[in-house]
Amino acid sequence: MDFGPYLMLATLEGAVTAAVLALTASGLALVFGIMRVVNVAHGEFFMLGAVLAWWVTDLMGATPVLGFAIALVVVPLMVAALATFADMTILKRINYDPERTIVATIGILYILQQVTLMTYGPDARPVTAPFNTRLALPWFERTEDGISLYWPWGLSITSYKLAVIGAAGGVLLGLWAVMKRSRLGLMMRATEQDREMALAFGIPVERIYALVFGMGAGLAALAAVLVVPIQQAHYLMGGDPLLLSFIVVIIGGLGSLPGTVLAALLIGLSDGIISVFFSPTLAKILATLLVAMLLVFRPQGMFGERRL
Amino acid sequence: MSVLVAKGLIRQFNGLRAVDNVTLEIPEQQVRALIGPNGAGKTTLVGLLSGRLACSNGRIDFLGRDITKVPPHKRIAMGMAYTFQITSIFPSLSVHENVAIAARRLCRNEKDTRAVVADALKRVSLAHVANTDAADLSYGHQRLLEIAMGLSQSPRLLILDEPTQGLAEGEVAEFIKLIHDIRQNTTVLLIEHNMDVVMQVADVVTVLNHGQVLFEGTPADVQANIEVQTAYLGGAHVKA
Amino acid sequence: MRRDVQKNLLLHGGVLVALFALQFVLPAYHHGNVARIMVLATYAMGYNLLFGYVDLLSLGHAVFFAAGLYGMGIAVSHLGVSAPLGLMIGVLAGGVVGAIIGALALRTEGVAFMIVTLMFAQAGYLIILYFGEITRGDEGFVIQQVDRLFFGGDLSDPFIRYYAAFTVFCISFLSILALLHSPFGKTLIAIRENQERAVMLGYNVMRFKLLAVIFSAALSALAGATYGLLFGYVGASFASVQYSIFPLLWVLLGGAGTALGPLVGVFFMFYLIDISSGMTTAYMLVAGVVLVGLTLFAPQGLMGEIRRRFWRWLP
């Protein structure tokens, strides 16, 4: 393949990564923005989403399309319920103390991961996509008669991947509308601004916290359900989304939703394109160091008022 | 030589000038009192002098050296000592260890440190509680502990932020005696609400109002000045 | 006061004597375990120095352990350096990495400090994988028996190995006790108790914290280098996040800011994991449950609770 088509392919693959990452990271950003806690178990909620999606579609064996549709609705709700439960039984009891919350969510991380290992097992299992048409894409070349289109071999994308991009975009728009337009979003933003004041105005802050923690986990799970037909479900798959979400949330300006989505696009796209030139490990090293340096040298600049 | 010279100090908080063009000069061996109604900018001004806050504008010289940009710990190391308005000690450590932490930086060995600590505790009459945890002291004793921590550093300038706040009458009398003892070899900047104390110990009084120097003079001058009286109207601190 | 000192001497002396004596009664399997526990406890003590006494919670100490492990391993296996010199190179590597990461990470505090240390450690782990030709990546490499001679003593021999682990543990344990009683240690504790006051007493708090990070890193690296020499294996898994979580877990379990906490924490956790890994592959479940349980019910850890309830004189 020539360089041009190759780059376009990398960009398209990058857009899929970016879409999934934007969903996952906005869950983490939501929790950090409103509750001021860092959820280290976020990647495990992603993993649970994928594993449960496999479980649901497996139960529905005969009708994979219907199974997947059910998984898409039910699995995020299941994961959100579990996260809400964890919030009420653990995080609330330690008063959302930032450092102790990190330690507790590390504990939750291991509990979720290891219980999955005990029940689901160590295998990676695929989920069939509900539809998966291969769409060949055209590229142009300069010939003696001017510019003409042709279909290079290998330059294609599946309809499912396009649907993932669309679905992620739709969900993010919906989330944005909820935050900006609804009464619930108003209460969330009030809690974010000033917890004490929100309490004084009769906003049920505790319930908002539980809900937000559940929503954050639900978004990660939804992203995982979307991605599981492309990537298999495995009990250790939570590590990468966690690290990437961290990076995205930090670059995006901790807690800001539009910033997070923008950063996810940047990271997702450049991940696809950079790995054309560098080894993926080197790309990860550079990204990790870059983010650490950002936190060290531009904490105010990135977070507005110093939030961490 | 003046121990401390501050010229044109300004500190803004979101457009509000908490300290507005303050100039101040404290000569050696003086006890300078800084008074003013609540919110006059006293604590902010002391924050600028000790380096806990950065100046928006102006210049501070300490012992003839420009310290405007010097971080607080270096100012202390140069010979400033600072006691907090809100008691700030090491609660879980013993009284002795509290003072030792203050003294140790300047001592060659632990034996020296012990001697300096014992001396400082004797001067504030806390020798008998040296092994008690600081948290278990009465409030008045904690204030004295703060002063002992200041004294043990043998400072060139001792800044005391409202040292008599919350003290009983007898303790205030003890404190006045202590200042007379300290003034033998130390310059003192005293932020004080209690006018009785100011009248008895200060050589010169600076009156701050709305972040500006309203008046500067001897305690007797201050008492006679009508402007100062007006500034205090409503604040019931002027007894004389 | 004096009686407390006596009790302390008796307790800590007793623990050291017991550790020494254990080797004569333990069956072979547990003999090896206790040697391992003593080395890991050294790592935990390095972590506790920072977490327990300076109140800095790092999520990236594996990078220091790995610096010692690989510093030693590469020097001994690739450069043909002798084991004692390799050990020193390992400790030095840890100190240097600690100085660099400390100088950067200390510009942040609280949650940002935790994330920055995590990120740096992750970068360290990836760097080890990236230079797979030297480090052999995930697979790791074995340190040959001929390279594990320490002044004539063969460190692969179980009894010499036990002595070596015991010596490293003792030296670290006693140096930490001495450090805490030195002016430096007392200043560190003062900074933990009331940082603002320490600044206003003229202490350069950043310098003290940086030195604490360097000591902590060097001690962790000593543990890493010793581990490699005693057990003959160097691998990237020791640089992974899990090995940053372990010292936090050990110290939380044993009791942060207590002298014996790290040993107690490693001991209990080691056997908890040892027993549960006999029953299931998902043995890290124990770690998760213990972490959550500790944050909820016993944030002071075992020795911390003992100190709070019974023995107020414990250091």
Where are these regions (language model features)?
Chain B
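Glycine-rich phosphate-binding loops of nucleotide-dependent enzymes
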Residues: M1-A240
